[in-house]
Amino acid sequence: MMRYSIRGPHKGPALLATAVALATVAACSGGSPSGSGTSAAAPSGTSSGTSASAAPTSAPPSPTPTPTRTYPLSTAPRTVPAVRDHEAARGPGWKPAAPAGVVVAANSAGLADEGKLLAGELGIPYRGAAAAGPGDVELALGGTGARESYTLTVRDGRVRITGPDEAGVFYGTRTLKQSVKGTGAMPEGVVTDAPAKPQRGLNVDIARKFFTAGWIEDRLREMADLKLNQFGLHFSDDQGFRIASDSHPEIVSAQHLSKAEVRRILALAQSLHITVVPEIDSPGHLGAVLRAHPDLQLRNVQGVPRQGAIDISKPASARIVDDLLREYSALFPGGWFHVGADEYQALTVRSPSASYPQLAAAARQKYGPQAGVQDLAEGWLNDRAAVVRAAGKTAKAWNDGFFRGGVVTADQRIEVEYWTGKEIGARPPAEYLAEGRKIVNLNDEYLYYVLGEPNQFTYPTGRRIYEQWTPLVLRGTTPVPARYAPQILGARFAVWCDLAGAQTPAQVANGIRMPLTALAQKVWDARTPTLTWEQFRTLATQVRG
C-alpha cells in the first residue's frame, strides 16, 4: 500500500494547508494535481492599488507530498526442497527484468558455467566477470560454510549468491530459478541453506531395460533442480551389459551406450554437480558376462549351473571382473564404484560347502581350515573393493554382502548400501551401524520402483515417502535410533527393471517424478515438513512444471 508523509515543523497546519492546496489545484486542473488547466487567481504579495505593507503575509508553501512505499515482511521462497532458513526483510524482492543480468564476482571465474545456465533459464543476459549493477544477479565463491551450502541475499534490487564451493552456489541458483518459476519473483531477505545429507540421488537399472543417453540426461536435469547429487548407474546384470567395452567387447549387449555417449552423460552430470556411480555387480548378477564365458559359470556338485553366479574359486573369474572394474574406473571420474556383492546364489542353499565343494576348498586354502563359502564370498568383496580403491574410488556394496560371524570380515571402508532385510545374509541395520559402518539408505519398502511389481513389490508413492519415511528408516517402517544419524550418508531412489516390458521409458519417468521429489525434500531437510502432502504436491507442480 502507499503511504504519503507530510514533512514540516507544524504537521497539523501543514497537512491542512496541503490538503486545501491540493484540492484547489485539482479542481482547477481537471482533477489532476499536475494538470495543465488554467490556474485560479491567488494572492501574490502585491497587487494594483494595494499597499504592500497592507498585504497579508503568506505562510511558507508546504512541501509537495512525497510518496513512499512500505512492504510487509517477506516470506520464505516457495521451493522444492524447501530452504532451511530464511531471514525475512521488507522490500520489493527481485524479478528478472531489464536491466538485470547475471555476473560473476572477482576470483570466481569457476562459476561461469553456472552463470550462463542461470541466465538462459531466467531469460536475462550473462555478463561474465563484471561488477554487479542495478537488478543484477551476482555469483561468488567465498565463506566458510559446510560443503554444498549457500547464502542467497536479495537486497536493494539485486541478488547475490555465495557459497564455499561451486556446488553450493549452483544450488542457490536452483532456489532462485524455482522461486521465479513459481511466483515470478524472489522475495526480499537472506536464505541460508545446506543439505542434511551428503549423498542424495537416483539409481537406474539400464542392464535389464535399456534407456537411451537422452533419457538419462533428462533425469540428470530433473535431479539437479531438486538439488540431488548422485546418480547410480547399474549397467551389468543377467539380462545385459550396456556400455561398450574395450577390454571385453564380447560381453556387450546389442543395445548399449557407446563410450562417447557415456562421456556426454558424464559431462552433463559434472556441469550439474552430479556424480555418476557405476555398478558392476559380482559375484552374482553376471549373466551377461557369463554368456560369453560359460566356463566361469558356477556349477554345483551335480554340474547344474546357477544363474548369474560366477565361480569365485577360479582365478580367471577374478581376472575378468577386475579387468572391467579397472576399465570403467578410468571412464567414470567420480569418487565411488559400486561392486554389488548381493544375492550370490552359492549362499542360498542349505549347505553351501556340500553343494559347492570347490568353493569350500578354495576358502580353506585362502583363509584357513575354519573358513567356508561365506568367507570366500566376503574375501571376494574385499578384493574387488581393493581394485577400485587403487583407482581412487570408494567402494559401495549391497548390505546382504556383509556377513556376520565368519573368518573374513568386510573391509570397514566399504559403504553399505542398505536395501533389504529379507535376503539371506541381510542383517538389521543397527548391526552395521553398531560396527561403525557408513550406510546409504535404499530401503526397498519405500524407495524401490520395480517394474511390473513382482515379488510383492508395489510402486512407491511420493506421499508415503513424504509422510512416513526419513533417512533413519533403513528397513521396513521402523527408524534406527537417532544417535546413528551421522553414519547415514543419505539415500537414493532406485528403479529396477525386473519386468522390463511393464512400462515404457516415458511411463517410468512419469512414475518416479513425485517419489523422487519427495525423497529430495527428505534428504535435504529430514525434519518434519511444514506443508501437507497436498500443498507440497501443488507446489512441486508449480515450480517444476
Predicted feature residues:
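Active-site beta-loop-alpha junctions enriched in small/polar residues
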Residues: A207, S236-G240, E279-H285, D342-Y344, ...
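Flexible, acidic glycine-rich loops studded with aromatic residues
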Residues: A395-D400, V407-G545
